[in-house]
């Protein structure tokens, strides 16, 4: 099957792992099945189309018949929101489909490369012999000040007041998967609700071809993290508080794998993951530390954005708040036609803050996208500088590193073959900021189980600290999050 695909980027700007970077080529270790996954060129159309119908009745009645008459095959359809994914349509068929009174928008997917990373540093091994800790304030890297993000956001004050989240609150991590066997995450992931929508893609004649759901090592679940990113994000939301403290450590995590070991995915895969999380997985919170910058005026993009908007609005109607990363391209989203998706369609879009040389923890991160029309709040994402000696690892965000990390430069995280050593990575990006907000949402939801999505959003926005220009500003909008205040004002 030809895959009509956009490749989403995970939104990490810097990894402190030996000489690792988010854009490193994928190693043939531990298996060589992915070796051509990065050979699909940016911008190449791959044969799949998203069709957005004017109403939900159109798709289930005449819509499917029309597509078949034009020579297309409906690969996936969501009648409740009027969206279908189609393969096999010619250029003339696309024109005819767009002209139909049944159809609102039609768009060809296309390949996009992930956003590049820049800075690197060193990995750290966790101390051996430590056990899960009920008190996140006792986690090694919180106690020594490395997890500064938990302090500035008021998480540590919330812990001291007894707010740790509850098992009944469920957070879906839409990402590269989760290393559910890492000591920080063991027992926290609901395996029965976890799933993978990530596919392995190879290039054949300049066209992306879907070879099926990304395979795993023997014994691993389909949602195992073969990268590192999803595990890092997940352990920021919740952890066993051994070396790193989780923001809301007692909540339940759901691994929804939508990005492959290349760190990229498709609009269809991400949208399918959202529907799974909000539907059968029954998530209260969705974290998406991923995204793509697209030109709203480019042909077909409107269909992709409208599809994503409908999927997210449907999730919100089911009671799920969707929190996404703004991106790391230093783009002013108030200007021009660039759209950061899915952030700008999400309930809350998150920019990043962080210190340089451990000074001014609330300054704007050098890489973050911004814009008052797009961003809702900011959170600690870590900071980097192009100047030699302009930042230290401690300016970044530390969290767990997957034992299946795929890049050759990340293989230090695979060193614990006997389970004796677990590794942690420093990283910076809006990817790292977003799970702080997801953790805040989970903590508020745990304390207020009946709170609505609107009430949850308002509590997060209106409790944020004004850390930039007085009033709402283009970099943080409502401010940098403060969960201790949010818990006081939440309805």
Where are these regions (language model features)?
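Autoinhibitory propeptides
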Residues: 64-146
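Substrate-binding/access-modulating region of protease and related hydrolase catalytic domains
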Residues: 25-26, 165-167, 240, 258-346, ...
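Sec-dependent bacterial lipoprotein signal peptides
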Residues: 1-20
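Short, surface-exposed ligand-recognition loops at beta-strand->loop->(often short) alpha-helix junctions
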Residues: 50-59
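Bacterial Sec-dependent N-terminal signal peptides
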Residues: 16-45
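Active-site core segment of subtilase-fold serine proteases
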Residues: 135-251, 272, 279-285, 290-295, ...
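Structural recognition of the beta-strand scaffold that forms the well-ordered cores
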Residues: 50-51, 85, 170-174, 235, ...
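Extracellular S/T/G-rich loop segment that most often corresponds to the catalytic His/Ser-adjacent loop
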Residues: 342-443, 486-488
């Amino acid at each position: 099957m030809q895959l009509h695909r956009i490749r989403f980027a995970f939104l990490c700007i810097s990894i402190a792992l030996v000489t690792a970077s988010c854009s490193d080529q994928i190693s043939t270790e531990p298996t060589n099945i992915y070796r051509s996954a990065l050979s699909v060129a940016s911008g190449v159309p791959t044969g799949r189309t998203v069709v957005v119908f004017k109403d939900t009745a159109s798709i289930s009645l005449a819509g499917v018949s029309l597509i078949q008459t034009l020579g297309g095959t409906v690969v996936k359809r969501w009648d409740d929101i009027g969206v279908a994914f189609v393969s096999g349509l010619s250029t003339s068929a696309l024109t005819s489909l767009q002209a139909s009174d049944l159809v609102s928008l039609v768009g060809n997917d296309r390949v996009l490369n992930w956003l590049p990373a820049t800075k690197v540093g060193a990995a750290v091994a966790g101390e051996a012999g430590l056990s899960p800790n009920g008190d996140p304030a006792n986690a090694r890297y919180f106690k020594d000040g490395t997890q500064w993000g938990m302090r500035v956001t008021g998480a540590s004050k919330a812990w001291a007041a007894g707010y740790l989240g509850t098992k009944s609150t469920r957070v879906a991590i839409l990402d590269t998967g989760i290393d559910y066997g890492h000591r920080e995450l063991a027992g926290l992931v609901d395996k029965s609700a976890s799933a993978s929508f990530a596919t392995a893609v190879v290039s054949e004649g300049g066209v992306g071809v879907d070879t099926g759901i990304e395979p795993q090592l023997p014994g691993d679940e389909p949602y195992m993290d073969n990268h590192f990113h999803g595990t890092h994000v997940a352990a920021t939301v919740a952890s066993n508080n051994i070396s790193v403290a989780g923001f809301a450590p007692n909540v339940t995590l759901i691994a929804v794998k939508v990005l492959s070991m290349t760190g990229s995915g498709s609009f269809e895969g991400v949208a399918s993951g959202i529907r799974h999380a909000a539907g059968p997985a029954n998530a209260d919170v969705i974290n998406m530390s991923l995204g793509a910058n697209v030109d709203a005026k480019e042909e077909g993009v409107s269909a992709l954005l409208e599809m994503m908007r409908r999927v997210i609005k449907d999730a919100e109607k089911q009671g799920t708040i969707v929190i996404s990363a703004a991106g790391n391209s230093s783009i002013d989203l108030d200007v021009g036609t660039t759209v950061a998706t899915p952030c700008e369609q999400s309930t809350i879009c998150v920019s990043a803050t962080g210190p340089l040389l451990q000074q001014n923890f609330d300054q704007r991160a050098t890489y973050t996208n911004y814009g008052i029309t797009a961003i809702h709040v900011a959170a600690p994402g870590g900071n980097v500088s192009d100047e030699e000696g302009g930042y230290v690892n401690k300016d970044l965000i530390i969290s767990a590193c997957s034992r299946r990390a795929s890049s050759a430069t990340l293989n230090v995280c695979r060193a614990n073959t006997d389970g004796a050593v677990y590794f942690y990575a420093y990283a910076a990006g809006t990817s790292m900021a977003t799970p702080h907000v997801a953790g805040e949402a989970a903590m508020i939801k745990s304390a207020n189980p009946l709170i609505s999505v609107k009430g949850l959003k308002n509590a997060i926005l209106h409790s944020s600290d004004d850390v930039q220009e007085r009033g709402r500003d283009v970099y943080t909008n409502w401010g940098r999050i403060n969960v201790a205040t949010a818990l006081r004002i939440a309805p």
